[in-house]
A protein has these predicted regions:
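Small/aliphatic-rich secondary-structure junction motif
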Residues: 1-58
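Structural beta-alpha unit
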Residues: 1, 24, 77-114, 151
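A short acidic, glycine-rich active-site loop
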Residues: 56-73
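General small-molecule cofactor/ligand-binding pocket signal
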Residues: 35-37, 90-94, 145
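Short secondary-structure boundary segments
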Residues: 38, 117-119, 148-149
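Short, flexible loop segments at boundaries between secondary-structure elements
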Residues: 141-151
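Short, hinge-like loop/turn segments at secondary-structure boundaries
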Residues: 52-55, 108-110, 132-134
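Glycine-rich, Arg-bearing micro-motifs that act as flexible, cationic patches
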Residues: 4, 113-139
């Protein structure tokens, strides 16, 4: 059975290019699927809300519902595009830091590749800031395909 392709997707034009590439990869491997992953970190001030007794727990649940409501149409459009190309697609909204979330999903699903888009930052910018493709390339046990930004 083919291994799923894990796609990091945030709705940007860069992730749209990554979606196109993931669809092509999937079509080149009959039977493979795409797991479209949207990662979102909870705001730092709400991290205590993981404890149900924390006063911020309700605020975190409200925040999560708002984010889900906002990103659902975007994720639906992306999944519909992949499915229209004949690729079975699953959508996941993961509440975690993107690099950790994408690696976890890829390992749990037995994926052979993580596909992400690049916003065109060079290696220095990637090394200085939190740049998901750069971090994945240097830390992931799962191979990573970085799709360049298309102007």
């Amino acid at each position: 059975m083919p291994h799923p392709i894990v796609l990091g997707y945030d709705g940007s034009s860069c992730s749209a290019a990554a979606l196109d590439e993931a669809v092509e990869l999937s079509r080149d491997t009959p039977g493979s699927t795409i797991v479209l992953v949207y990662c979102h970190e909870p705001p730092p001030g709400l991290s205590c809300a993981l404890d149900p007794g924390c006063a911020a727990a309700k605020a975190l649940r409200d925040y999560e519902r708002r984010v889900e409501h906002e990103v659902e149409p975007m994720l639906h459009r992306a999944a519909t595009k992949a499915r229209a190309a004949g690729v079975e697609t699953e959508v996941l909204l993961v509440w975690d830091e993107p690099v950790r979330a994408l690696e976890d999903v890829a390992r749990k699903r037995g994926s052979r590749v993580i596909v992400v888009g690049s916003h065109g930052e060079g290696p220095i910018a990637g090394a200085l800031g939190r740049h998901t493709p750069f971090e994945l390339l240097h830390h992931s046990d799962v191979p990573v395909l970085v799709v360049p930004h298309r102007h």
